[in-house]
């Protein structure tokens, strides 16, 4: 009975003609294509980034050439105040969700005023760039009209122009100590923590006959700073190259060495004046992942307890293996008196040196890190070269922190050799 009832139903089915099947498939594909296209469109719109450069005047400031020096105390102080004003203005505005970043790029002193050149980044989910530019300009104009506080700004001097991503990156990369890419955490070199690409763009590898030998810091288009003892084996430029990036091999953006300038008072086998400059045959083309660190002013102070970061491809433990990828360590500057104590280095730390790490040990620079950078960010998150990895007793030992050449002590010497 059940079978006989089902048979007529089965027998009554009709197959669709091939043209109808093809038409149906094409219709489904068209709908899928439309959905995918809309998704791609809205995702692209959502991620649309706009870059701007501009300028405005700060009035009633006596002429001072120090405002032109990007590392001077005067320049950083005024830039910090203006950057805070911009952040407050945008974050309290109706486009705070579109706001990404704003920075003072340069200050140009004039008679009784300073022109501030600015750099801005925004996103706009609706891709209405002209409307966005007008709103940004309006917020900046209102900010400049509000002259509360010690500064007097001129709203009539405001200029704002949209620029390309390429030009925006070029502006930032030509300034010292800026990091387009950042990591939220720092760990140790001894023990291992890998740096991100572009996180430490001034870090370089000094190579002898193609093999990593020491670290170095890019301080100018053709100049790097390193340790003098890195040239005990050879200082013949023909045997030396410099490369950048996070991988120690293969070489990335390799450059040849024209000259090695070793401090005149350095003595082989001793630790004082362990400083050298590398001059390259050609200029380094700055980019997001390769550009220079800031040099501190000779008068700049980095007190004990200040947080610093050391980077390099040195051994992960004493006489241990060396990493393929760049390592980083977050450490602290140690009081010189504590470092000169009998249980530590017994008076061997000179005024031109500084100790950094922890008296408890463990986190430290190690073999192969020599010549590399010890850096510190200022309140504007601009990074300065505080020290040069020089010497220590093994790696990560209790009461034996790393010892670095104090860059401020050699600031005049560096300027005399490089013009920087």
UniProtKB/Swiss-Prot annotation:
One of its GO terms (cellular component) is extracellular region. One of its GO terms (biological process) is proteolysis. Residues 48-165 form the SEA domain. The active site is at 229 (charge relay system), 274 (charge relay system), 370 (charge relay system). It is found in: Membrane; Cell membrane. GO terms for molecular function: serine-type endopeptidase activity; serine-type peptidase activity. The keyword DNA-binding does not apply. Glycans are attached at residues 111, 146, 239. The keyword Disulfide bond applies. InterPro entries: Pept_S1A_HAT/DESC1, Peptidase_S1_PA, Peptidase_S1_PA_chymotrypsin, Peptidase_S1A, SEA_dom, SEA_dom_sf, Trypsin_dom, TRYPSIN_HIS. Residues 41-420 are extracellular. It is a single-pass type II membrane protein. SMART domains: Tryp_SPc. Keywords: Cell membrane, Disulfide bond, Glycoprotein, Hydrolase, Membrane, Protease, Serine protease, Signal-anchor, Transmembrane, Transmembrane helix. SUPFAM superfamilies: SEA domain, Trypsin-like serine proteases. Gene3D superfamilies: SEA domain, Trypsin-like serine proteases. It is an enzyme of class 3 (hydrolase). Belongs to the peptidase S1 family. PANTHER family: ACROSIN-RELATED (PTHR24252), TRANSMEMBRANE PROTEASE SERINE 11C ISOFORM X1 (PTHR24252:SF28). This is Transmembrane protease serine 11B-like protein.
């Amino acid at each position: 009975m059940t079978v006989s009832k089902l048979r007529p139903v089965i027998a009554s089915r009709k197959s669709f003609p091939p043209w109808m099947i093809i038409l149906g498939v094409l219709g489904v594909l068209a709908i899928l294509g439309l959905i995918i296209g809309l998704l791609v469109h809205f995702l692209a719109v959502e991620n649309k980034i706009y870059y701007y450069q501009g300028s405005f005047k700060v009035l009633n400031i006596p002429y001072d050439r120090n405002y032109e020096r990007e590392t001077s105390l005067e320049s950083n102080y005024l830039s910090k105040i203006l950057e805070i004003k911009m952040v407050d203005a945008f974050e309290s505005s109706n486009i705070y969700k579109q706001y990404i970043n704003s920075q003072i790029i340069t200050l140009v002193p004039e008679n009784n005023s300073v022109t501030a050149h600015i750099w801005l980044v925004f996103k706009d989910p609706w891709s209405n760039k002209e409307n966005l530019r007008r709103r940004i300009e309006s917020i900046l104009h209102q900010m400049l009209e509000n002259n509360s506080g010690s500064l007097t700004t001129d709203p009539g001097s405001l200029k704002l122009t949209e620029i390309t991503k390429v030009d925006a990156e070029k502006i930032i990369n030509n300034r010292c100590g800026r990091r387009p890419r950042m990591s939220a955490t720092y760990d140790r070199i001894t023990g291992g923590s890998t740096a991100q690409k572009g996180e430490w763009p001034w870090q370089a590898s000094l190579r002898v006959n193609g093999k990593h030998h020491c670290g170095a810091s890019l301080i100018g288009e053709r100049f790097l700073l390193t340790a003098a003892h890195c040239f005990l084996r050879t200082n013949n430029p023909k045997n030396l190259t410099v490369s950048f990036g996070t991988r120690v091999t293969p070489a990335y953006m390799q450059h040849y060495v024209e000259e090695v300038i070793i401090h005149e008072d350095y003595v082989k086998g001793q630790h004082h004046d362990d400083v050298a400059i590398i001059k390259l045959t050609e200029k380094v083309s700055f980019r997001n992942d390769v550009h220079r660190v800031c040099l501190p002013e000779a008068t700049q102070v980095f007190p004990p307890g200040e947080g610093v970061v050391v980077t390099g491809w040195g051994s992960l433990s004493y006489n241990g293996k060396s990493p393929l990828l760049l390592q980083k360590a977050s450490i602290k500057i140690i009081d010189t008196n504590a470092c000169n104590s009998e249980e530590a280095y017994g008076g061997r730390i000179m005024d031109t040196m500084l100790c950094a790490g922890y008296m408890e040990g463990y986190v430290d620079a190690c073999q192969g890190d020599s010549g590399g950078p010890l850096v510190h960010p200022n309140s504007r998150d601009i990074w300065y070269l505080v020290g040069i990895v020089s010497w220590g007793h093994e790696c990560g030992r209790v009461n034996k922190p790393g010892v670095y050449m104090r860059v401020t002590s050699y600031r005049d010497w560096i300027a005399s050799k490089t013009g920087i």
